[in-house]
């Protein structure tokens, strides 16, 4: 079977949920026995989001092969339960970088390099590359931004051309749009959708399916109207209502017939959709009987997308323990010695996620100390582990002023220091320790009991590491180095001997958690937090 291509565009406004729509469709097609891959085209000129502020972009999602990518790739991985790669997130910056590099090498000798055909050909090659050598049945490509944006035009032109390059029977265009509800008149309005599709058609793309985001039910009459003005059949107008839980969306879209429409359009030879496992999972999520309160202590807490994979992984841990996870978002800048008890008195577990820089660092260190002293389950990720280590060195070893050399280059006790292979690197973008690395676990440690394996593989994104100069005295004072690189040179996991559940990890376990396969550390962190809750009840 030829590889089929599905392109998901968006209209009217951004943040409509194109990524969730693409991920949900991917799940439905996988449930039909098809091999699916999903990619995202981002129209910004940055090479990747690695140097962008979380306030601008949200979380940076890291793949196994070390690519810093859009947070939508996290949704894709969680929904289709497949590990993606750097080929699954392409930016305008990458496209132009590649074309200009080829021009400098003389690959276009004699030609005037232009948007068409050189940029569009490069874009098309990235679409095809996802499926190369992998026997992929369906490639779903989300086009970032909104139809009408200048930045998106080369991508839209490229996918218009692909339809004729590979054959119209091998391409399906899905347009996600907004049908707003006006409370004053009590009406849903279709005009924004009509204009969005008109804009798309003006550049040569006729959508095959229109997915309408709405907070109210869309009547058959309205679907008929949208179909008439947008040149699609009524049955090809799909409503996508707001859902209480993201993982309900595939089932909602299946009930609307989205996957059937796609299979019919692409003439896909596949099984009927078997959503049994997904239905069981969603039903379980709806019936969770326990509650657990987790403090997430960070500096971007007003923008939840900055920690989206952590939030999802906490929820997955809750699913495995029949528990709703209630997150208390705490800005680490607000935490002081005088008010920490007020902030954390009703908390069952404390999590400090990754991050960079000195803003709010002392509040994170205080939170780690509170968890250590009060035997509250603690989970520190990347910078969160480093904060726990700094607090331990200050309080237990009495190393006054102990710190990370990232935050205080003049500290007398740099218990966290720049990795040796990072010291001669000047550029910021894509130069950290990135991607999947092995980690050897200490037998009988909390981490080993969680994983049940001798060697694990986790994804990293950092420049600073545990300083081995202090290894012996930290171990003698009760710190357990439960995970290291295979050569034992890099400390990847720390625990505290006399604590029921205190773990810091240098990697990012949240990136590998799935709703149907919760990450073992998040699963056990929630379990320990539930036990802590009962203890203090």
Curated annotation (Swiss-Prot):
Among InterPro entries, the record links this protein to: Class_I_gatase-like, CTP_synthase, CTP_synthase_N, GATASE, GATase1_CTP_Synthase, P-loop_NTPase
* Catalytic residues (UniProt): 382, 508, 510
Cellular component GO terms held in the UniProt record: cytosol
Q: Which CDD domains match?
A: CTPS_N, GATase1_CTP_Synthase
- Mind listing the GO molecular function terms for this protein? ATP binding; CTP synthase activity; glutaminase activity; identical protein binding; metal ion binding
Query: Where along the chain is Mg(2+) bound?
Result: 72, 142
Gene3D superfamilies on file: 3.40.50.880, P-loop containing nucleotide triphosphate hydrolases
Enumerate the residues binding UTP.
14, 189-194, 225
Q: Which residues bind CTP?
A: 14, 149-151, 189-194, 225
Q: What is its EC number?
A: 6.3.4.2
Pathway annotation: Pyrimidine metabolism; CTP biosynthesis via de novo pathway; CTP from UDP: step 2/2
User: What ranges does the record give for the region Amidoligase domain, renumbered to this chain?
Assistant: 1-268
Which keywords fit this entry according to its UniProt record? Answer: ATP-binding, Glutamine amidotransferase, Ligase, Magnesium, Metal-binding, Nucleotide-binding, Pyrimidine biosynthesis
**What does the sequence similarity comment in the record state about its family?**
Belongs to the CTP synthase family.
Query: What is the protein's name according to its record?
Result: CTP synthase
């Amino acid at each position: 079977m030829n590889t089929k291509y599905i392109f998901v565009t968006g209209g009217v406004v951004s943040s409509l949920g194109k990524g969730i729509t693409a991920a949900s469709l991917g799940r439905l097609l996988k449930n039909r026995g098809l091999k699916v891959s999903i990619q995202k085209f981002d129209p910004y000129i940055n090479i990747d989001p690695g140097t962008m502020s979380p306030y601008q972009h949200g979380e940076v999602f890291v793949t196994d092969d070390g690519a810093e990518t859009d947070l939508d790739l996290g949704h894709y991985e969680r929904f289709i339960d497949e590990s993606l790669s750097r080929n699954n997130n392409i930016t305008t910056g990458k496209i132009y970088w590649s074309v200009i590099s080829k021009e400098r090498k003389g690959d276009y000798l004699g030609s005037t390099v232009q948007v068409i055909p050189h940029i569009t050909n490069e874009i098309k090659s990235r679409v095809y590359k996802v499926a190369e050598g992998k026997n992929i049945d369906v490639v779903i490509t989300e086009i970032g931004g909104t139809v009408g944006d200048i930045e998106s035009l080369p991508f839209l032109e490229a996918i218009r051309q692909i339809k004729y390059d590979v054959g119209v029977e091998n391409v399906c265009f899905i347009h996600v749009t907004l049908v707003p509800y006006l409370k004053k008149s009590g009406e849903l309005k279709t005009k924004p959708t009509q204009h969005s599709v008109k804009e798309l058609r003006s550049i040569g793309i006729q959508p095959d399916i229109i997915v309408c985001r709405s907070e109210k039910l869309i009547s058959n009459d309205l679907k008929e109207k949208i179909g008439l003005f947008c040149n699609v059949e009524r049955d090809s107008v799909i409503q996508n209502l707001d859902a209480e839980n993201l993982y309900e969306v595939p089932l909602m879209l299946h009930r609307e017939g989205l996957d059937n429409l796609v299979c019919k359009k692409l003439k896909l030879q596949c099984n009927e959709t078997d959503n049994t496992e997904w239905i069981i999972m969603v039903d379980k999520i709806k019936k969770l009987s326990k509650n657990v309160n987790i403090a997430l202590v960070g500096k971007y807490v007003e923008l939840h997308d900055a920690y989206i994979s952590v939030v999802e992984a906490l929820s997955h841990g809750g699913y495995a323990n029949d528990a709703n996870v209630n997150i208390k978002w705490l800005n680490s800048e607000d935490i002081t010695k005088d008010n920490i008890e007020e902030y954390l008195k009703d908390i069952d577990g404390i999590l400090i996620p990754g991050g960079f820089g000195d803003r709010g660092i002392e509040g994170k260190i205080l939170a780690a100390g509170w968890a250590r002293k009060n035997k509250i389950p603690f989970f520190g990720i990347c910078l969160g582990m480093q904060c726990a280590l700094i607090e331990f060195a200050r309080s237990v070893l009495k190393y006054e002023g102990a710190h990370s050399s990232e935050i205080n280059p003049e500290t007398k006790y740099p218990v966290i220091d720049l990795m040796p292979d990072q010291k001669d690197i000047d550029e910021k973008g894509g130069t950290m320790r990135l991607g999947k690395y092995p980690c050897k676990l200490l037998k009988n440690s909390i981490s080993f009991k969680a994983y049940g394996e001798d060697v694990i593989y986790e994804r990293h994104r950092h420049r600073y590491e545990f300083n081995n100069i202090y290894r012996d005295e930290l171990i003698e004072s009760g710190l357990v180095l439960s995970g290291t690189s295979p050569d034992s040179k890099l400390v990847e996991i720390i625990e505290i001997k006399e604590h029921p559940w205190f773990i810091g990890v240098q990697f990012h376990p949240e990136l590998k958690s799935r709703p149907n396969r919760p990450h073992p550390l998040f699963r056990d962190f929630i379990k320990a937090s539930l036990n802590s809750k009962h203890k203090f009840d």
